[in-house]
Amino acid sequence: MSGSVIPCVGAIVADGEGRLLMIKRGHEPGAGLWSIPGGRIEPGETDAEAVAREMIEETGLTVEVGRLIGRVQRPGLNGAVIDIRDYAATVTGGTLRAGDDAADARWVAPGELAALEITDGLIDALTGWGVLGARQ
């Protein structure tokens, strides 16, 4: 997959108290690190369909997918580029539970993010996009 681009999506979800929905990754890449829910886009899926599917799989929650918040690219294996498009999403149903490759799922207050081991660059991206205030 040298030089290939792997399209992925993420969901930026906040509750009524301003907490972010975070998952603890259960598998590589980034096993044991906290991140927003998301993953690879399956063939034939739109970004919104992929966000909705990943949310159900990883958190048990259904969502309405909103606007594109931001985009990042990360190095993948064998020279691949992981192209991640992160979308706003609003919970419409379900019960929060960790599933699929998520070892844990929880609502986290912005001030508590610093206490978690978070995937590289996530805090900077969320801050740069205006999702978070001053550096947490």
Question: Where would I find each of the regions flagged by the language model?
Answer:
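Conserved N-terminal beta-strand and adjoining loop/helix that marks the start
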Residues: 1-20, 40
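Short connector loops at helix/strand junctions that flank enzyme active sites
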Residues: 6, 36, 63, 82-84, ...
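Active-site-adjacent beta-strand/loop module that shapes the phosphate/pyrophosphate-binding cleft
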Residues: 15, 72-95, 106
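Conserved Nudix-box catalytic region and its N-terminal flanking loop in Nudix hydrolases
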Residues: 19-57, 61
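Nudix hydrolase/Nudix homology domain
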Residues: 33-34, 97-136
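Structural detector for helix-capping/boundary residues
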Residues: 39, 53, 66, 108-111
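A short coil-to-beta-strand element that immediately follows conserved catalytic motifs
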Residues: 61-70
